[in-house]
């Protein structure tokens, strides 16, 4: 059954693991994601309401929210939940499965497992641009292909944030070498 992006982000997030996500000549298999739950989640960009910067997260679900992180990295979320709710899933890490040569040109001389490891590196490998903001994930610029079989996954605390960090809203494929952060004990296993 296809992913329903009108569901809450914490329901959508683990369904994205193992999906092939393609943009600008590079395809990655998603191995790590984080859910952000809008107004109820102090770590979400949408916690304090809708702004020009975060408007893409307010829907419709299934569209990209691209933003600048730490003043230099372009990171991407997929908006989730009904329009107006402001939830999304941050794409944290993946394995390059097509377009490896293009990813290396964008990322430089890094180990293969680090080509799309971490949200900024993933954004660089896939060449996210601010002009991609609001783009549908299954349109002309982005494609998402679901796996024939869903991988096992675990969840645990999010990383790189201070607010609501202990919430088990980071989801990853256990043992995958492309996962960006290995600290944090899994709280759930599926």
Swiss-Prot record:
Enzyme Commission number(s) of this protein: 3.2.2.-
GO biological process: base-excision repair
CDD domains on file: AAG
One GO MF term: alkylbase DNA N-glycosylase activity
UniProt keyword list: DNA damage, DNA repair, Hydrolase
A Pfam family it matches: Pur_DNA_glyco
Cited InterPro entries: Formyl_transferase-like_C_sf, MPG, MPG_sf
Protein family according to the UniProt entry: Belongs to the DNA glycosylase MPG family.
Name assigned to this protein: Putative 3-methyladenine DNA glycosylase
């Amino acid at each position: 059954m296809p992913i329903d992006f009108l569901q809450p982000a914490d329901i959508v997030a683990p369904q994205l693991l193992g999906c092939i996500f393609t943009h600008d000549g590079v395809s990655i298999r998603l191995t790590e994601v984080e859910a952000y739950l809008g107004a109820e989640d102090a770590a979400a960009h949408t916690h304090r309401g809708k702004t020009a910067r975060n408007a893409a997260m307010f829907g419709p679900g299934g569209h990209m929210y691209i933003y600048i992180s730490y003043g230099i990295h372009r990171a991407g979320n997929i908006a989730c939940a009904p329009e107006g709710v402001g939830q999304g899933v941050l794409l944290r890490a993946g394995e390059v499965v097509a377009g490896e040569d293009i990813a290396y040109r964008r990322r430089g001389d890094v180990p293969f497992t680090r080509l799309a490891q971490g949200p900024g590196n993933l954004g660089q490998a896939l060449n996210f641009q601010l002009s991609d903001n609001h783009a549908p994930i299954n349109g002309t610029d982005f494609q998402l292909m679901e796996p024939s079989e869903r991988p096992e996954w675990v969840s645990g605390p999010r990383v790189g944030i201070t607010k609501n960090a202990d919430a088990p809203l980071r989801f990853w494929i256990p043992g995958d070498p492309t996962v960006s952060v290995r600290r944090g004990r899994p709280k759930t296993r599926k």
